[in-house]
């Protein structure tokens, strides 16, 4: 806009200057014309020619003046837009004046030549001259008016320039303010970004602290649960010891008074034919320490019965034949673990296997009583309260005719001094022996031959389910009825509401059914729920779930049927990695055919050497981590579920996953590389091939190893074994991401069809399901 105003002002100035020049030129021409007219009039030209020329010149001058005045007037009333047109008009008038000048010049020439016919008089010339002078005066006034307009325009121009300068100044100030605002905004934005980053860092720190507190709370909860489970286990152990003490005292009373009857029970049982199968009493199970001591004290002076050294083989328990002797029995006592003592077979058979009876040595009675008194004194020191007899009555009462124990058995005085107490102890001993005979029939007689008492003894003692004995006594009268029971019958007839308890009974019944069909009882039957809850869960590093497994009575057969949904729904194993750890631990048991002896033998061989890592326990993995100079991180694997089967059988559990489980920071690349090198030397896939395909610890007939059976079907007709365990697929694409967040997508355990011919009645909800976002934790 300022540029347009400047250009307009320049054009106006140029037009005014050109008009001034034209007016000056016109004045000069008029002066020259007047002078020539005066010369003509003074020179005495013709009387007719002089006035005529003067008149024409005056007329021309008047015309020019009139036109100039008109032009000036138009210029005064015109606007700035009409200035250009006025300049053009002035130029045209100048052109006309020039033409008139030429005409006047021609007239002068004609007048000089005497061609003019008429000459104005001097008076007329004077009149015309006066008129011209007036016209000139008007022209001067017009010029002055034009000059005044020019001055006014210049003033307006100056005002416009000053206004433009003010606008420029205002604009510059606004621009400066805008720059200041932008500068302040940028600074404020940077400060806001810094504050947001600081808040984000603080938030991350608080999140880490929150998760750390949660982890610590979880650890504290797990530790409290583990302590609570240990306390419960100790209480249960105390009750079992009390029961065993009562059994020992009553057995002692029975042995001292009824040795011939004890001798008859120790003899090999008669054979029972069932088709081509022969059921023989197996006497290779160890006795409890107290009873073994009493028997050795009573019978040490007599030679063993010849039948004790014969080889006894039972189709129900297809074990390696063993020669029973006093030395081997003593060695069995020394090598037995607390879990072995607590097993159903040990508890139920400990009173049935002894040396050959002989005459009672009365002189040896006092040391036996003294040893029992020492045991009772130790028990009283641990628990100074009156011992309850509920568990003992449940174990040794028969049916609905339950009798109280003789209180004289727990007296420190000599039990032989009173005839009444002696007779009561004999009757109680007979009931105990009757119950033990029923338990003995459980392992020596097919289930279809069982009577009602044998079924009740099996349910109460072997299966550890005394809560269902009453309903069983009312509804189940024989083993054939037990074999024909369905899951609905178990729930309605026996009141078994727990699905896991029903499955435990179903698996046991099917196992005995297979034993009658010609196969032996599975070795998983030797793994009772005490061993699973105490020893096995501790070996795989998940002892925090011991109480749940104990409550649901999970034994070896149950382990072989557990699936992901069972772990999550019934056993409260919610973490995916813990579920995988348990399933891989079961897979290892499956590879060794659920042989506890074979597993312990392999673990003993690799205790001091870094070999056979597939059988490593969680404690052995911790020892290996300490041996490779990572002891500051070893404690993070406690109760983490990391054991040898996870390290070997799961190919996606690599060094990154192990480092994450150990809690090694991602920035410590040297430690992670060191761990990867150590793992590659121990857990290389080629090192475990022989372990997984070990011929020494083969799989049951009709089942291939879970590592090599992929893509093959079992055509041998063993539907139970074919559907008993589902193969484990890839658990995930990786365990090492913790950017949980450590939250990559992981794969899943493969689902396979359980088979329509599954005799174990595997429930639909127990089938293996997929795992999503599997996560390794060090909690």
UniProtKB/Swiss-Prot annotation:
**Does the keyword Nucleus belong to this entry?**
yes
Tell me which domain of life the UniProt entry assigns to the organism this sequence originates from.
Answer: Eukaryota
Q: Compositional bias of type Polar residues: which residue ranges?
A: 415-426
Q: Where is this region: Disordered?
A: 295-366, 403-429, 685-779
Q: Which UniProt keywords apply?
A: Cell junction, Coiled coil, Cytoplasm, Cytoskeleton, Keratinization, Nucleus, Phosphoprotein, Repeat
Ranges of residues in domain SAM:
450-515, 528-592, 616-683
Indicate whether Coiled coil appears among the record's keywords.
yes
Q: For the modification Phosphoserine, which residues carry it?
A: 356, 371, 391
Q: Which PROSITE patterns match?
A: SAM_DOMAIN
Output the GO biological process annotations, alphabetical, semicolon-separated: keratinization
Q: In which tissues is it expressed?
A: Expressed in skin interfollicular epidermis and hair follicles. Expressed in tongue epithelium basal suprabasal layers.
Q: Which GO terms describe its cellular component?
A: cornified envelope; cytoskeleton; cytosol; desmosome; nuclear speck
Q: Which residues form a coiled coil?
A: 79-261
Note the InterPro entries from the entry. Kazrin, Kazrin_SAM_rpt_1, Kazrin_SAM_rpt_2, Kazrin_SAM_rpt_3, SAM, SAM/pointed_sf
> Where does it localize?
Cell junction; Nucleus; Cytoplasm, Cytoskeleton
The Basic and acidic residues compositionally biased stretches are 736-746
Q: Which CDD domains match?
A: SAM_kazrin_repeat1, SAM_kazrin_repeat2, SAM_kazrin_repeat3
Q: Which SMART domains match?
A: SAM
Q: Which family does it belong to?
A: Belongs to the kazrin family.
What functional role does this protein have? Component of the cornified envelope of keratinocytes. May be involved in the interplay between adherens junctions and desmosomes. The function in the nucleus is not known.
Q: What is the protein name stated in its UniProt record? A: Kazrin
Organism of origin is Mus musculus (Mouse)
Q: Which gene encodes it?
A: Kazn
């Amino acid at each position: 806009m300022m540029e347009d105003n400047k250009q307009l002002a320049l054009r106006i100035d140029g037009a005014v200057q050109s008009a001034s020049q034209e007016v000056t030129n016109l004045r000069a021409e008029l002066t020259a014309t007047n002078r020539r007219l005066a010369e003509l009039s003074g020179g005495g030209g013709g009387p007719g020619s002089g006035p005529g020329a003067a008149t024409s010149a005056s007329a021309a001058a008047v015309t020019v003046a009139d036109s100039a005045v008109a032009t000036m007037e138009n210029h005064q009333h015109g606007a700035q837009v009409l200035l250009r047109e006025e300049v053009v008009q002035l130029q045209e008038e100048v052109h006309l004046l020039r033409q008139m000048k030429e005409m006047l010049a021609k007239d002068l020439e004609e007048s000089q030549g005497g061609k003019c016919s008429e000459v104005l008089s001097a008076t007329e010339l004077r009149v015309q001259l006066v008129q011209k002078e007036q016209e000139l005066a008007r022209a001067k006034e017009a010029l002055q008016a034009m000059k005044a307009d020019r001055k006014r325009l210049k003033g307006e121009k100056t005002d416009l320039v000053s206004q433009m300068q003010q606008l420029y100044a205002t604009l510059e100030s606004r621009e400066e303010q805008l720059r200041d605002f932008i500068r302040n905004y940028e600074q404020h934005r940077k400060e806001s970004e810094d504050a947001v980053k600081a808040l984000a860092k603080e938030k991350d720190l608080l999140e880490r602290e929150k998760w750390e507190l949660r982890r610590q709370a979880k650890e504290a909860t797990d530790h409290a649960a583990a302590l609570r489970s240990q306390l419960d286990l100790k209480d249960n152990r105390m009750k079992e010891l009390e029961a065993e003490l009562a059994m020992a005292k009553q057995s002692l009373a029975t042995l001292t008074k009824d040795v011939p009857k004890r001798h008859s029970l120790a003899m090999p049982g008669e054979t029972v034919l069932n088709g081509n199968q022969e059921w023989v009493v197996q006497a290779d199970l160890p006795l409890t320490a107290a009873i073994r001591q009493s028997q050795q004290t009573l019978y040490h002076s007599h030679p063993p019965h010849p039948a004790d050294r014969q080889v006894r083989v039972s189709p129900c328990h297809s074990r390696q034949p063993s020669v029973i002797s006093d030395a081997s029995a003593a060695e069995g006592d020394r090598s037995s673990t607390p879990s072995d003592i607590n097993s159903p077979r040990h508890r139920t058979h400990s009173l049935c296997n002894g040396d050959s009876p002989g005459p009672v040595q009365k002189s040896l009675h006092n040391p036996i009583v003294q040893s029992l008194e020492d045991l009772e004194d130790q028990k009283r020191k641990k628990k100074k309260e009156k011992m309850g007899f509920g568990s003992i009555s449940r174990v040794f009462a028969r049916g609905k005719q339950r009798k109280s124990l003789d209180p004289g058995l727990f007296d420190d005085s000599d039990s032989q001094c009173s005839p009444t107490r002696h007779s009561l102890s004999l009757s109680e001993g007979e009931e105990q022996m009757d119950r033990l005979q029923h338990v003995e029939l459980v392992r020596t007689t097919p289930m279809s031959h069982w009577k009602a008492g044998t079924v009740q003894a099996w349910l109460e003692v072997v299966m550890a389910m005394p809560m269902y004995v009453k309903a069983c006594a009312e509804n189940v009268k024989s083993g054939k009825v037990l074999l024909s029971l369905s899951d609905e019958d178990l729930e309605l007839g026996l009141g078994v509401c727990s699905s896991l308890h029903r499955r435990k009974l179903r698996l046991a019944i099917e196992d005995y059914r297979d034993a009658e069909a010609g196969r032996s009882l599975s070795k998983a039957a030797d793994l009772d729920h005490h061993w699973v809850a105490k020893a096995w869960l501790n070996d795989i590093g998940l002892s925090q779930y011991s109480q749940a497994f104990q409550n649901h009575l999970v034994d070896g057969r149950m382990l072989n049927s557990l699936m992901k949904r069972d772990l999550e729904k019934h056993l409260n194993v919610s973490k995916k990695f813990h579920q995988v750890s348990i399933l891989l631990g079961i897979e290892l048991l499956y590879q060794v055919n659920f042989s506890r002896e074979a597993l312990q033998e392999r673990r003993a061989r690799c205790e001091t050497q870094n070999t056979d890592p597939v059988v490593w326990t969680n404690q052995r993995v911790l020892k290996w981590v300490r041996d490779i100079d990572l002891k500051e991180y070893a404690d993070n694997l406690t109760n983490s579920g990391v054991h040898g089967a996870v390290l070997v059988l799961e190919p996606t559990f690599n060094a990154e996953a192990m480092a994450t489980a150990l809690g090694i920071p991602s920035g410590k690349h040297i430690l992670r590389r060191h761990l990867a090198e150590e793992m590659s030397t121990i857990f290389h896939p080629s090192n475990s091939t022989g372990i997984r395909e070990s011929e020494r610890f083969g799989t049951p007939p009709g089942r291939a190893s879970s590592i090599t059976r992929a893509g093959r079907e079992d055509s041998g007709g063993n539907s139970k074994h074919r559907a008993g365990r589902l193969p484990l697929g890839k658990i995930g694409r990786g365990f090492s991401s913790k950017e949980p967040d450590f939250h990559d997508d992981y794969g899943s355990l493969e689902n396979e069809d359980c088979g329509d011919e599954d005799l174990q009645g595997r429930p639909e909800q127990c089938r293996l399901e997929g795992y999503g976002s599997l996560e390794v934790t060090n909690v």
